[in-house]
Amino acid sequence: MASLVAQANVELPEIDWFALSPVLVLIGTAVAMLVVAGLTRPWARGMYALVTVVGACTAGALAMVLWVEVSNDGPRTIVNGSLALDHLALWGTITICVAIVLAALVTEDYLRRESMDGPEVYALYLSAAVGGVVMLAANDLVVTFLGLETLSLSLYVLASSHRRRAESTESGFKYFILGGFASAFFLYGIALVYGTTGSTNISDVAGVLDAEVLLQGDDVMLLAGVGLLLVGLAFKVAAVPFHFWAPDVYQGAPTPVTAFMASAGKAAAFLAMLRVLVVALPSLADDWRPVIWVLAVASLVLGSILAVVQTDVKRMLAYSSISHAGFILVGVEAAGHVGRVNDGTASSALYLLFYAVLVIGTFGVVTLVTRTGDGATDIGAFRGLASERPLLALGLTVFLVAQAGVPLTSGFIAKFGVIEAAVDVESYAIAIIAMVSAVVAAYLYLRIMVSMWLTGTEEGDTEREPVRVPLSAGIAIAAAAAFTLVFGIFPGWLIEASEQVAALAR
């Protein structure tokens, strides 16, 4: 093979394997688990989850080591400029690894309860994580698309993984069809950007735009390409008006999968959006920033209002996630202002980490309350939870008040950060809308808390299946609650770390 390459005068890129180690560990863990599980007897109880957790922790630890290296040596590109090694990529990698660990712990008992034991779901978590990491670290739009498709295909299968539930199959099919359209828009956007600038490399695109060497008429095609890129990314983050898939998919998918989708999937898509807009298209900020503004306002307003009128908790949380997407878009909009990239980028990245932990903790409790069949997701299922499982109700209360933005929780720090970033760039209108949206959404969380703490069980409720709290899910929920409170009270270290995220490889 080496002689053939030499004869063809093909120059292979130098590869820094250690820089790729988090991705390689995730891939290796998924492949090894599938191969070994296929060649041996069924593994002991909980082993699939344990292997997944170990793999994700190892990848996260390697990302932390690389963080120190990048802090000392500065950001750079790797694999011939197709991937970026910077704090944004490593922050996203760590966020996704945290999501894998928590989701795997919540999933372990769920799969056994639903008679779905097997390594497939865990392997799909890992493959989705690989796609997400590649997507957010990509320094080339084609590589971004490859990561996007790897992430998306894994999530499509995960959404439909509960084959005995028609709702799960329907949600996976719907997500696949609509996601295919979004991917097509994104790919066509890449084609238009390439046709205009002559490159798909993010750094090269930025160089061409900064040099202002576009031919007459090319600016229209370029703006069309940027618009199509935003359509594809807005679909993945479930921003209004590209949110229509989220409520049905969140409701129909297995609850732990919904948690992973809302955390890791959203983090990857948002960080990829930040990289594309801030690195490749800063010279077009005056063109894309108003679009982000409209998406943010629409998501904040519609997400909060529609969440309040729902009676199914998973649909409530789906619309709530749309509202949270609006908050993150507030940070993205702030990052589009000249000279203030750091504030918006750092606040968005911090929000994504805090939200990932919050949403998995919330869905972890929902997973336990819905019981066998994953169908009891009406708000009435939470009646009297405080009297039956007071610690579980307390944990859910922590997550809900954090999502509402109550002080001394990580949710308050996250929301305060993006609103402060908007105020700093004088986007006062969107900051006010965000604060009003937070007040409206608080009513949603209050409804669930009232059902848990102030509403007693009704006749017939005593016959329902009791709520079990298995060890693995209990650890995940307790860890998420502790994280929410500790970094809500002492956020300084993470805030300082997030401020380094804006130093992007170019």
Give, region by region, the residue ranges found by the protein language model.
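Alpha-helical transmembrane segments of multi-pass membrane proteins predominantly involved
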Residues: 1-506
